[in-house]
Amino acid sequence: MSNRSVCREASHAGSWYSASGSQLSAQLDGWLSQAQTSKRPARAIIAPHAGYTYCGSCAAHAYKQVDPSVTRRVFILGPSHHVALSRCALSTVDIYRTPLYDLHVDQKVYGELWKTGMFERMSLQTDEDEHSIEMHLPYTAKAMESHKDDLTIVPVLVGALSESKEQEFGKVFSKYLADPTNLFVISSDFCHWGQRFRYTYYDESQGEIYRSIENLDKMGMSIIEQLDPVQFSNYLKKYHNTICGRHPIGVLLNAATELQKNGVNMSFSFLNYAQSSQCRSWQDSSVSYAAGALVVH
C-alpha cells in the first residue's frame, strides 16, 4: 500500500462510542451475545446510528444476522445530516479508521459507481462531520472480524432524493444487491419526537405518547417489511414521520423491488425496536431505533 493513502479519522470515537479498541470490542461482543441469529445470512440490514449507549444493543440484532463467511463487501448507505445533497456522494478517501482496525474502500466498485455519472464526491470535512456512516464502521469491523483481510467497504452518503431518484439509485444498486457476497447496511433511526425535533404527532387513541410513537413507527416498519417503496413514500407524506434514513431506506426498497421483478425471492423482518426514553408529556422527547434484516431465499 502506498503511503499516499488518504484516511478518514474515526472522528466520533471518544464521544459517540469508545475510542479504546479493547473496550469497544468487549462492548460490541456483549451486545451481540444478547441477540439471536434468525435471519442469516443477511443481504441487507437496517440499523440505527445514534451513540452506542443509546442504540448499541438494538443495532446488535441486525449485525448478528451478518455472515462473515459469505460477505466480502459492505455497502453503507447513510443519510446526510449536515450538507444539502440532492444526489448520492462517494468518499474521497482510501481508508476509514476505526478503533478496531482500518477498513478499506472498494475502489473498483467506486469506479463503477462514478462512471454512471449519478454520484458526486463529498469532501473529507463532510465525511468526518457525518456520523451516519461512521456509527456502522465499528459494528461492521466486529461482525466481519474473522474475515477482515477479505473485506472492503463502499460508503455512500445519500442526499434528499426525490422518489424518481430513489428509483434510479435503486436500479443502480440492485445489481450489487443481487450478489450474495455483498451486504447493504442501511443507516437510519426512526421517529424523532418532541418539540426540539419540531415533530409532535400524537394519536390519543393509542394511550401514552410513547405508545402512539411506537404505533406510528411500526406502521412504517410493516410497510418496509412488505418491500413497497410507493407505500413507504405515501406513509411519509401522510404522517411526516421523522425517519432520518428515509432516503437510504427508499433506495433499498427500490433495489429490492427491481430484483423481485426479475423473480428474486426475498423477505425483510424487523428484529428489534427501542426508544431512547418513554415520552409521556409534551416536554419529553425521544428517538426510536429499529433493527432488521433482508434475506434472499
Curated annotation (Swiss-Prot):
Superkingdom to which the source organism belongs: Eukaryota
Coiled-coil parts of chain: none
Gene3D superfamilies, per database record: LigB-like
Transmembrane intervals: none
Pfam families: Memo
Subunit structure: Interacts with ERBB2.
Function statement: May control cell migration by relaying extracellular chemotactic signals to the microtubule cytoskeleton. Mediator of ERBB2 signaling.
Name of the featured protein: Protein MEMO1
Lineage of origin: Eukaryota, Metazoa, Chordata, Craniata, Vertebrata
